[in-house]
């Protein structure tokens, strides 16, 4: 029978519920417990796929093609659990499902209400997502007190009764703000947050208290007494310089023991050796490199969360401190590429919209002409093809039809047909809806023999996750290949171009990939493409005699 840990948050948002939930999952997994994670999002959007990165941050893509909350990325990076569509759902999805059932007559003419119909749908989805796990860690998005969260909180309250006391644990993350004029941490916001939860009918078993300094023993006792939890269950969560230290911090305070005791689980002792080794590698690098990250949303790095973490993972596995220099592509458009001169490698990530594209193309041109290691991901690959077409293949004005419909050389165009993960044919037109209409999820890619990509991956065939509508135009690909562009990877069956590179005698390391390799990187194994990229940056640094 699956047991549940429900994670809620109070006082303010963005306290790190996702990191706390992922860290608990990592500790429990090290004890031999099979865990999974769910994220319940109270917003009415169907998914974050069409939301602005400035509103929501990164959209994390799963193997089965779900566009999900970025917290699912944390769950996959911290544990071995694979996330899927069932692991993340929103108010929009819940209401959509209930309304469709009502239209089909499944409620037999009853008045459809929030309780029981919406809450029952939430409970059913939680159970479906938790199936097969020993422990399901369920994070409820938002902040206690928000009106949007109420149906979700009511649903988990009901599960607390229905599943039995030894099968459910409630963990509440809260904030203890420090008031400089008073010279102390304030517990009152936490007390009020717990009071809100208890009014709903949920009594937290564990309190995770975020603070920027150590919480005095007396304050912890006060919190325990006024919030009706055991003193040892008031866990101190101090700010850390790396999220990968959090599992160790929580384990030191016996969080996993408290959870196992509450859920009546007998398990072996936790072994966090792998996390300890990661921290050693992170804190004692042997090298340093500087990478230019040329993007559109660089003021909000949460938009590139998985990519930034993947670069950090590569640093861990190459014993390198990777210093990411964030550069706004619009600034490069206005001021030129001088800012790139002192850097060891250049990266252009995925993105949407025309704004800043010429700045990215200028950065790509600089990388190609100056033999600076270059990695282009999704749009970063497409713009590398555009730059090559314009400046090498003799196609002036070449562009993507996403940005210029009447370009004389549409080297990038809308994918009109492809096979999805199940082998079903997907079709799109320019008039298709924006939401949920991209080529999404895990896709197979065949790597060409003798290519750099093949040597990096060490395999003839790979599977990576996609999120895009546009692809290299096969009708113009032959001319690009004639001029020296190497198509290093293709999708079997459709022959879509998935990876490009330049010959070794032209450029030491120039790779573009249509997929998003960052979605499958984790701190324990890293990812071969990012590790190779950082090694290329180190080699470039050495060649320049730095």
Swiss-Prot record:
Residues annotated to bind CTP: 13, 146-148, 186-191, 222
Active site, per annotation: 378, 516, 518
Binding site for L-glutamine: 351, 379-382, 402, 469
UniProt domain Glutamine amidotransferase type-1: residue ranges: 290-543
This protein's GO CC annotations: cytosol
Protein name listed in UniProt: CTP synthase
Binding positions for Mg(2+) per the UniProt entry: 71, 139
Activity regulation information from UniProt: Allosterically activated by GTP, when glutamine is the substrate; GTP has no effect on the reaction when ammonia is the substrate. The allosteric effector GTP functions by stabilizing the protein conformation that binds the tetrahedral intermediate(s) formed during glutamine hydrolysis. Inhibited by the product CTP, via allosteric rather than competitive inhibition.
Family membership noted in the UniProt record: Belongs to the CTP synthase family.
HAMAP family, sorted: PyrG
Keywords: ATP-binding, Glutamine amidotransferase, Ligase, Magnesium, Metal-binding, Nucleotide-binding, Pyrimidine biosynthesis
Function comment: Catalyzes the ATP-dependent amination of UTP to CTP with either L-glutamine or ammonia as the source of nitrogen. Regulates intracellular CTP levels through interactions with the four ribonucleotide triphosphates.
Binding partners and assembly: Homotetramer.
Misc. comment: CTPSs have evolved a hybrid strategy for distinguishing between UTP and CTP. The overlapping regions of the product feedback inhibitory and substrate sites recognize a common feature in both compounds, the triphosphate moiety. To differentiate isosteric substrate and product pyrimidine rings, an additional pocket far from the expected kinase/ligase catalytic site, specifically recognizes the cytosine and ribose portions of the product inhibitor.
UniProt region (Amidoligase domain), positions on chain: 1-265
């Amino acid at each position: 029978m699956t047991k549940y840990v429900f994670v809620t948050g109070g006082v303010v948002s963005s306290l790190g519920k996702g990191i706390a939930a992922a860290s608990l999952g990592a500790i429990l997994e090290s004890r031999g417990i099979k865990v999974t994670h769910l994220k319940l999002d109270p917003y009415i959007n169907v998914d974050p796929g069409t939301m602005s990165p400035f509103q929501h941050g990164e959209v994390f893509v799963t193997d089965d093609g779900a566009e999900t909350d970025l917290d699912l990325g944390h769950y996959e990076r911290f544990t071995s659990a694979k996330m899927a569509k069932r692991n993340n759902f929103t108010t929009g999805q819940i209401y959509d499902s209930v309304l469709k059932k009502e239209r089909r007559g499944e409620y037999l003419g009853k008045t459809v209400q929030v309780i029981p119909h919406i809450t029952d749908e939430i409970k059913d989805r939680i159970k479906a997502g938790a199936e097969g796990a020993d422990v399901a860690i369920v994070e409820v998005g938002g902040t206690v007190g928000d009106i949007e969260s109420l149906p979700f909180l009511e649903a988990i309250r009901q599960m607390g009764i229905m599943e039995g006391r030894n099968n459910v644990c409630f963990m509440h993350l809260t904030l203890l703000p420090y008031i400089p004029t008073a010279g102390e941490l304030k517990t009152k916001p936490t007390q009020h947050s717990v009071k809100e939860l208890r009014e709903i009918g949920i009594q937290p078993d564990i309190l995770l208290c975020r603070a920027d300094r150590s919480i005095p023993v007396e304050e912890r006792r006060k919190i325990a007494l006024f919030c009706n939890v055991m003193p040892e269950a008031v866990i101190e969560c101090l700010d850390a310089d790396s999220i990968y230290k959090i599992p160790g911090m929580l384990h030191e305070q016996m969080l996993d023991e408290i959870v196992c005791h509450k859920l009546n689980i007998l398990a072996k002792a936790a072994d966090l050796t792998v996390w300890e080794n990661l921290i050693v590698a992170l804190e004692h690098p042997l090298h340093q490199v500087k990478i230019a990250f040329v993007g559109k949303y660089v003021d909000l790095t949460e938009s590139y969360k998985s990519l930034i973490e993947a670069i950090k993972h590569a640093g861990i596995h190459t014993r390198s401190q990777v210093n990411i220099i964030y550069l706004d592509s619009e600034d490069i458009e206005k001021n030129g590429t001088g800012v790139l001169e002192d850097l060891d490698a250049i990266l252009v990530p995925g993105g949407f919209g025309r704004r800043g594209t010429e700045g990215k193309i200028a950065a790509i041109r600089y990388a190609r002409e100056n033999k600076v290691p270059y990695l282009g991901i999704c749009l970063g690959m497409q713009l590398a093809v555009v730059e090559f077409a314009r400046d090498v293949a003799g196609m002036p004005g070449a562009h993507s039809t996403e940005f210029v419909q009447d370009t004389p050389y549409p080297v990038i165009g809308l994918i009109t047909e492809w096979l999805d993960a199940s082998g079903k044919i997907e079709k799109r037109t320019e008039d298709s809806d924006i939401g949920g209409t991209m080529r999404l999820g895990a896709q197979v890619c065949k790597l060409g023999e003798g290519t750099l990509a093949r040597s990096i991956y060490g395999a003839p065939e790979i599977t990576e996750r996609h999120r895009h509508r546009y692809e290299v135009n096969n009708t113009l690909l032959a001319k690009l290949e004639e001029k020296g562009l190497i198509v290093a990877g293709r999708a079997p069956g459709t022959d879509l171009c998935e990876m490009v590179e330049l010959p070794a005698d032209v450029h030491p390391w120039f790779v573009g990939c249509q997929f998003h390799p960052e979605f499958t990187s984790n701190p324990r194994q890293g990812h071969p493409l990012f590790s190779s990229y950082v090694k290329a940056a180190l080699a470039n640094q050495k060649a320049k005699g730095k």
